[in-house]
Amino acid sequence: MSCCGGSCGCGSGCKCGSGCGGCGMYPDLEKSTTFTIIQGVAPMNNFEELGEKAAEGGNGCKCGSNCTCDPCNC
């Protein structure tokens, strides 16, 4: 994805941000991973996938020309 020359990221409200975080809505959450492990008599559940889906956030919002979001459907 383009980040408008490294100076743009789509921020809240699909407006231009100051950093190049992959042009996601919440660049600080894109690389976070959450693990929950509960062991006992019940089967072990791993909620890693749920955390990744919640962290995506961008929903197709990416930086276009002139530091604007294209498409703007955040």
UniProtKB/Swiss-Prot annotation:
Keywords recorded for this protein, A-Z: Metal-binding, Metal-thiolate cluster
Q: Which domain of life is it from?
A: Eukaryota
Alphabetical list of InterPro entries matching this protein:
Metalthion_15p (IPR000347)
- The cysteines joined by S-S bonds are none
One GO molecular-function entry: metal ion binding
| Listed transmembrane segments | none
Pfam families tied to this protein: Metallothio_2 (PF01439)
Claim: Secreted is one of the keywords in the record: no
Family note: Belongs to the metallothionein superfamily. Type 15 family.
Role summary: Metallothioneins have a high content of cysteine residues that bind various heavy metals.
PANTHER family, alphabetized: METALLOTHIONEIN-LIKE PROTEIN (PTHR33543:SF39), METALLOTHIONEIN-LIKE PROTEIN 2A (PTHR33543)
**Descriptive protein name:** Metallothionein-like protein type 2
Its taxonomic placement starts with: Eukaryota, Viridiplantae, Streptophyta, Embryophyta, Tracheophyta
